[in-house]
From Swiss-Prot:
Keyword Disulfide bond: yes
One of the record's GO molecular function terms: acetylcholine receptor activity
Transmembrane segments: 282-302, 307-327, 337-357, 413-433
Domain of life according to the entry: Eukaryota
InterPro entries: Neur_chan_lig-bd, Neur_chan_lig-bd_sf, Neur_channel, Neurotransmitter_ion_chnl_CS
Name of protein: Acetylcholine receptor-like protein cup-4
Disulfide bonds: C178-C192
Purpose: Thought to regulate endocytosis in coelomocytes through modulation of phospholipase C activity. Possible acetylcholine receptor.
Keyword Glycoprotein applies: yes
Gene behind the chain: cup-4
PANTHER family recorded: NEUROTRANSMITTER GATED ION CHANNEL
Any Pfam family matching the protein: Neur_chan_LBD
Keywords annotated in UniProt: Cytoplasmic vesicle, Disulfide bond, Endocytosis, Glycoprotein, Ion channel, Ion transport, Ligand-gated ion channel, Membrane, Receptor, Signal, Transmembrane, Transmembrane helix, Transport
Length: 433
C-alpha cells in the first residue's frame, strides 16, 4: 500500500515539475519556437542595421541629449595638429589637423544582449546631436562653415544602461588672423591663438579640454616625429586654455551661479608660440656688415684720396645689394624697424658721410684752397698725439697757414680710430642685445 502511494505521488507531482524545468531550458533561440539558425547566420552589418533602426527610432538630432534639460552637456575637446603654416606678410596662421570631441547621450541607448553583444555603433555625423562650434577669429569670418569637415564619422559606445558615449573626430583647416611683431627680427618670438567657442550658452553646452591635455603635435612620422621647424619658423610650444565670454568681455574665471551660466559662452584657446629660424643670418647679413664696416674704417688709413674715393663708391654699391637682399626677405608688417636694418642704415649713412668728407678733402687739396681759420684750431690736437704717430702728422711749425694735405694727415687717422670704436659699439647694441 505504501509503495502504491509513493508511485502515485511521483506521477502526480514530480514528473510535471521536471518537464516544466526542461521546457524552460529550451526557451529562446534553442527552443522549438526559436530560430537559432537565423540568429547566428546574421552578419555583423545586419546586426548594425537593426541596431541603428532601434536607436534612431524617434531620435531627434536637434534635441540636446539630456533627459533633464536643467543639466548642461559637457563636451571634452582635444586637438591633434599635423601642420602649421605661418604667412608673415598676410599676418595669418593656418592650422591643419583633427579635433576630438566627446560627450554623453542619454537617448542613444540599447541593450547589447539584443544585438549579439554589440557595444559600439559607427554612424554618420549628421545622424546624431553635435555641439555647434565656431572660430571667433577665423579669417573666413565668424559664420564660416568650412573650418571643420562635415563628413566625419561618429562612434557610439554603450556606457552602462542609461547613457552612451559619443566620439567624433573631424578634420579641420583653420586660418586665423594674428598680430605679429617682428621688431626683434631675426630673433623675434610671436604667438597666435585659435579661439573656439560654442554657439550655445554654458547653461546648455560647456566646452572643456580633455583631461587638461595639451594639443598633440604630429608634423612627421617615424624619425621625423619630433619635427618642429616649418619654413622660416620653429614651433616652440602649443598650449590650450579655457576662457569664458560674458558681458562683452573674455575672462579666465568660470561662472558660478546659474544666472551667469545663461549669459556666458565657453571658449577654448589654442596658442601656438614660434620663433624665427634663420641659421644663415650671421653668414648672410652679419658678416657682410662687418666686412663693410671694416673697409669704411680702413679708408681713413689710405694715403691716396682718389683711391679712397673709388673704394667708397664701391662700398656704397655693395651695401645697396646687401640691403636689397635683406629687405626682400624682411616681413612687411613691423611695428618698429628691426635693429639689423638700423645697423645697415647707419652703415650707409656712415659711408655717405665718409664719402662727403673725403670728397671735400680731395677738392680742397686739388684746388689748393686755404684752410679756413676755424679749422686751424684742429691742429691743437697735434700736441696730444703720442710720439709714435707724430712722424705721420709732422707739420712745420714755421708755417702760419696749414694746407689741406696737412689737415688730412692729422684728422684722418683720428677719425678712423673713433669710427672703429663707434662701429663696434653699434654692432654690440644692434646684434647682441
Amino acid at each position: 500500500m505504501k509503495i502504491i502511494i509513493f508511485v502515485c505521488f511521483i506521477l502526480i507531482f514530480y514528473l510535471p515539475i521536471q518537464k516544466k524545468h526542461v521546457n524552460s531550458q529550451q526557451q529562446g533561440i534553442d527552443s522549438d519556437d526559436g530560430d537559432a539558425e537565423s540568429f547566428f547566420n546574421k552578419s555583423y552589418s545586419e546586426h548594425q542595421s537593426a541596431l541603428e533602426q532601434k536607436i534612431f527610432r524617434g531620435y531627434n538630432p536637434k534635441n540636446r541629449p539630456m533627459k533633464n534639460a536643467s543639466f548642461p552637456t559637457i563636451v571634452d575637446v582635444h586637438w591633434h595638429i599635423i601642420h602649421v603654416s605661418i604667412n608673415q606678410r598676410e599676418q595669418t596662421m593656418t592650422v591643419h589637423g583633427h579635433i576630438y570631441m566627446r560627450w554623453f547621450d542619454e537617448f542613444l541607448v540599447w541593450d547589447p544582449k539584443d544585438f549579439n553583444n554589440i557595444q559600439y555603433a559607427r554612424v554618420k555625423k549628421w545622424q546624431v546631436w553635435q555641439p555647434k562650434i565656431k572660430v571667433s577669429n577665423s579669417a573666413s569670418g565668424l559664420g564660416s562653415a568650412f573650418d571643420f569637415s562635415t563628413s566625419a564619422h561618429v562612434i557610439i559606445q554603450m556606457m552602462g544602461k542609461d547613457r552612451a558615449k559619443v566620439e567624433m573626430y573631424p578634420t579641420f583647416s583653420i586660418k586665423v588672423g594674428c598680430a605679429f611683431d617682428f621688431t626683434d627680427y631675426p630673433y623675434d618670438l610671436n604667438k597666435c591663438a585659435i579661439n573656439l567657442f560654442s554657439t550655445s550658452t554654458m547653461a546648455d553646452v560647456q566646452l572643456q579640454n580633455l583631461y587638461a591635455i595639451p594639443p598633440t603635435l604630429s608634423f612627421g612620422w617615424e624619425e621625423q616625429k619630433m619635427k618642429r621647424i616649418i619654413s622660416d619658423f620653429k614651433i616652440q610650444n602649443v598650449s590650450s586654455s579655457a576662457l569664458y565670454y560674458t558681458n562683452g568681455n573674455i575672462t579666465s574665471s568660470a561662472p558660478i551661479t546659474g544666472f551667469d551660466l545663461g549669459s556666458t559662452w565657453s571658449m577654448l584657446a589654442v596658442t601656438v608660440s614660434f620663433v624665427r629660424h634663420s641659421p644663415l643670418f650671421e653668414a648672410a647679413v652679419v658678416t657682410p656688415c662687418i666686412v663693410v664696416a671694416s673697409l669704411i674704417s680702413m679708408t681713413f688709413f689710405i694715403d691716396s684720396l682718389s683711391s679712397t674715393f673709388l673704394l667708397m663708391m664701391l662700398h656704397f654699391y655693395v651695401q645697396l645689394i646687401f640691403l636689397h637682399d635683406l629687405v626682400e626677405k624682411l616681413p612687411l608688417s613691423v611695428s618698429e624697424i628691426p635693429f639689423c636694418i638700423k645697423l645697415i642704415g647707419i652703415l650707409m649713412y656712415t659711408n655717405g658721410l665718409t664719402l662727403v668728407l673725403h670728397s671735400s678733402l680731395l677738392c680742397g687739396s686739388y684746388y689748393k684752397c686755404p684752410v679756413p681759420q676755424q679749422l686751424n684750431k684742429i691742429f691743437v690736437i697735434e700736441e696730444y698725439i703720442p710720439n709714435t704717430f707724430k712722424e705721420k702728422v709732422q707739420i712745420k711749425k714755421e708755417e702760419s697757414n696749414k694746407s689741406w694735405r696737412d689737415l688730412m694727415k692729422l684728422i684722418r687717422p683720428i677719425i678712423g680710430f673713433v669710427l672703429i670704436i663707434l662701429l663696434i659699439c653699434m654692432f654690440f647694441v644692434c646684434l647682441l642685445l
